[in-house]
A protein has these predicted regions:
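Gly/Pro-enriched, hydrophobic low-complexity segments
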Residues: 60-65, 123-184
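Short, exposed beta-strand/loop patches in secreted or surface proteins that constitute
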Residues: 22-23, 49-54, 74-77, 122-130, ...
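Short, surface-exposed beta-strand/loop "edge" segments at domain boundaries and coil↔beta transitions
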Residues: 40-45, 67-73, 90-96, 144-150, ...
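An acidic-aromatic
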Residues: 53-111
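Sec-dependent N-terminal signal peptides
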Residues: 1-3
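N-terminal leader/targeting segments and the immediate start of mature chains
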Residues: 5, 9-58, 68, 182-184
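One face of beta-strands
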Residues: 28-36, 43-53, 57-63, 72, ...
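Flexible, processing/modification-adjacent segments and terminal tails
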Residues: 25, 85-143
Length: 184
């Protein structure tokens, strides 16, 4: 009897993960405003950016804050951040990706979307914040660069991204807060 209860609990998590993959795989595009906090250990940097996801073409972003970086943008094409171009005022810098992809303000959302489209979450649970029901998912990866963990919170209704925390070797290095979101 206990085994049956445990197996039923596992099935629910798989269904939630499947629903998330199906939703993000079918999503044609969205526009979002992101607030990103990057914790480099010795300093914490805050960024804001407008992000555009386009399933059929490239993703793009434009930094809106801090003012000293405002206007810098980038594009990422393909399914794995292998094609990344940093742009500013008509100039482009190709191959600007860091060695440890998915943990920088420039590529975090792109890689997180790939996890939501294709990844199998290690854990799925429900939470409530400010009266909104949320689905929370945790993704874990071991690589030659170390352990990467990502936790993402989506609205239960509509599966809209709300917040994410990214960890490298157990240390939180990045948070993403989605303050505006519109599917296109």
């Amino acid at each position: 009897m206990l085994l049956a209860v445990l197996l039923c609990g596992c099935g629910g998590a798989q269904t939630d993960g499947e629903a998330v993959r199906t939703h993000f795989d079918a999503l044609p595009g969205f526009e979002a405003h992101l607030k990103i906090l990057s914790d480099l250990g010795q300093s914490v940097l805050e960024y804001e950016m407008d992000y555009v996801y386009n399933k059929e073409d490239t993703d793009s972003f434009t930094i809106t804050a801090p003012e000293s970086l405002s206007g810098i943008g980038g594009t990422i094409a393909g399914t794995d951040s292998a094609s990344f171009t940093l742009q500013y005022d008509g100039l482009s810098l190709d191959d600007a990706m860091p060695q440890r992809t998915g943990l920088t303000p420039a590529d975090a959302m792109f890689c997180l979307l790939d996890d939501l489209r294709t990844g199998e979450p290690a854990q799925v649970w429900s939470e409530s914040a400010s009266g909104t029901e949320l689905a929370a998912l945790k993704y874990e990866y071991d690589s030659e660069d170390g352990k990467i963990e990502k936790q993402v919170w989506l609205t239960r209704q509509g599966l809209q991204p709300v917040y994410a925390e990214l960890y490298a070797d157990g240390t939180r290095v990045l948070t993403i807060q989605v303050t505006e979101y519109r599917e296109t």
